[in-house]
Amino acid sequence: MCIRDSNKVVGEWLAKQGYDYIRPEFTYGKSRIDFYMEKGEQKYLLEVKGCTLEVDGIGYFPDAPTERGVKHLHELAQAQQAGYRCAVAFVIQMEGITEVRPNVSTQPEFGTALAEAKAAGVRVLFLLCRVGRDSLEIVEQREG
């Protein structure tokens, strides 16, 4: 599975969540956020992160340094303060994993940015998946 698979499966999942409007690849600030949605008058931003690293039954992100991921978290925190409802969704691409933690040994800045985003009101979602040889399906959502 790759990042495109994560975004595709989240797009399919979002279509079932009752939004009035969904737009992928939305520019906010200096970033391209994975999804912009509307429900009534409320505006939402969602950034998707695919989690494929597991250590002792826990998912970790990122598996390699991602300056872009840090930047996206800062943009989401700013958007949350500007009135958007924002979330980062970790698509867990391994069965049996129910949470994702920041991989601070690989990139401590991501852990700091995630904590700051949460403090600003950005929701953290864990999207648990059923993984097949050629398929990926979201089967459960948990809050982080």
PLM region spans:
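Domain-level recognition of nuclease-like catalytic cores that cleave nucleotide substrates
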Residues: 93-144
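Short, structured patches in soluble enzyme cores that scaffold and shape functional sites
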Residues: 26, 37-39, 48-50, 90-92, ...
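Conserved catalytic cores of phosphodiester-cleaving nucleases, focusing on short active-site segments
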Residues: 35-63, 76
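A short, acidic, amphipathic alpha-helical segment used as a generic capping/interface helix at domain edges
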Residues: 70-78, 109-113
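Conserved small/polar residues in nucleotide/adenosyl-binding loops
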Residues: 1-6
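Charge/polar-rich, low-complexity and marginally structured segments
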Residues: 26-29, 33, 66
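Nucleic-acid nuclease catalytic cores
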Residues: 57-67, 77-106, 128
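A short acidic/basic microdomain associated with nuclease active sites
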Residues: 13-28
